[in-house]
């Protein structure tokens, strides 16, 4: 509901295509916290860290991004916050924050800016740690979307569970999956209980780690297709973003399920922070 209100009441702001001045974006997500510093429509500093304490995590990444940009906190002219901790951060950094906005519209803006697709149509897929989003945009403005993670477990979390069972870091899962064949192992990401059962069973059956990783990625791609993309009129190109877009095996699986290789822009995990920095410059 919040996203619908934003789309209606802030359409002019959402149509903004360029960042101006010196602005910061903070994305307080369930798994990671990201910060971006932008100046004159360019990213000049960025940082991320696993999410722990909302304020401490955001302060850390903001300082890291500022150091990378060669700037100080006082140099920031405006800041935008998004993600689960956006209101807490909006209060903590209230001397700088001009925008506190839900992640669906902010992420969409960051995605089309990073992919250089601000004009025309596109579909954005964001597979997150707590939920999945599929968003259609026209000229950078969302006009339809669907959100969800089935049962108590969302797709990004399922990939983390798989990685732990394979005793690897989630950043290694994609390369492992690219070497496997998902058809050799059955996997279910729709529910944490059944997902764990499938992991235990397939590994107990002696399936290779490569095949299990590939099956996990394919299962997630199928979930997004069946639960999210069936609810919207998919438009092309397809832009895949968020932290899970760095898992190459998942991107491969999404392409196989959809029959179209998705675009994964550089810095795709920073969509929320980029969107926050860009949109907050509209208040200068």
Please identify what each model-predicted range represents.
Residues 109-113, 156-160, 252, 265-284:
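Glycine-rich phosphate-binding/hydrolytic loop that grips phosphoryl groups
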Residues 97-106, 255-274:
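Conserved phosphate-binding/catalytic loops in two-lobed NTP-binding clefts
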Residues 195-230, 269:
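Adenine-nucleotide phosphate-binding core of ATP-dependent small-molecule kinases
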Residues 7-44, 120-138, 182-185:
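Gly/Thr-rich phosphate-binding beta-strand-loop-beta motif of the actin/hexokinase/Hsp70
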Residues 82-85, 228-257, 268-272:
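Glycine-rich phosphate-binding loops at beta-strand->alpha-helix junctions
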Residues 53, 139-179, 278:
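Glycine-rich phosphate-binding loop plus the immediately following alpha-helix
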Residues 3-18, 87-125, 133, 137-140, ...:
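Conserved phosphate-binding catalytic cores of ATP/NTP-utilizing and phosphoryl-transfer enzymes
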Residues 20-64, 142-151:
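Short glycine-rich, Thr/Ser-proximal phosphate-binding strand/loop in the N-terminal lobe
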């Amino acid at each position: 509901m919040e996203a619908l209100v934003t789309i209606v009441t802030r359409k002019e702001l959402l149509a903004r295509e360029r960042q101006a001045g010196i602005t910061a974006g903070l994305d307080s997500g369930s798994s990671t916290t990201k910060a971006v510093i932008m100046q004159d429509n360019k990213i000049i500093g960025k940082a991320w860290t696993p999410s722990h304490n909302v304020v401490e995590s955001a302060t850390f990444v903001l300082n890291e991004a500022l150091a990378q940009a060669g700037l100080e906190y006082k140099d920031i002219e405006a800041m935008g916050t998004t993600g689960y901790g956006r209101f807490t951060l909006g209060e903590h950094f209230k001397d700088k924050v001009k925008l506190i906005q839900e992640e669906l519209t902010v992420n969409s803006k960051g995605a089309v800016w990073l992919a250089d697709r601000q004009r025309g149509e596109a579909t954005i897929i964001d597979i997150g740690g707590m939920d999945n989003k599929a968003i259609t945009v026209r000229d950078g403005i969302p006009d339809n979307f669907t959100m969800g993670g089935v049962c108590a477990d969302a797709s990004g979390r399922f990939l983390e569970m798989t990685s732990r069972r394979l005793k690897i870091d989630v950043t290694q899962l994609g390369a492992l999956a690219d070497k496997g064949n998902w058809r050799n192992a059955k996997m279910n990401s729709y529910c944490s209980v059944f997902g764990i059962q499938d992991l235990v069973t397939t590994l107990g059956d002696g399936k290779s780690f490569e095949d299990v990783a590939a099956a996990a990625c394919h299962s997630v791609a199928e979930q997004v297709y069946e639960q999210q993309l069936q609810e919207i009129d998919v438009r092309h190109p397809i832009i895949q973003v968020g932290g899970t877009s760095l898992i190459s095996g998942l991107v491969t699986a999404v392409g196989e399920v959809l029959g179209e290789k998705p675009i994964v822009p550089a810095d795709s995990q920073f969509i929320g922070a980029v969107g926050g920095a860009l949109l907050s410059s509209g208040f200068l």
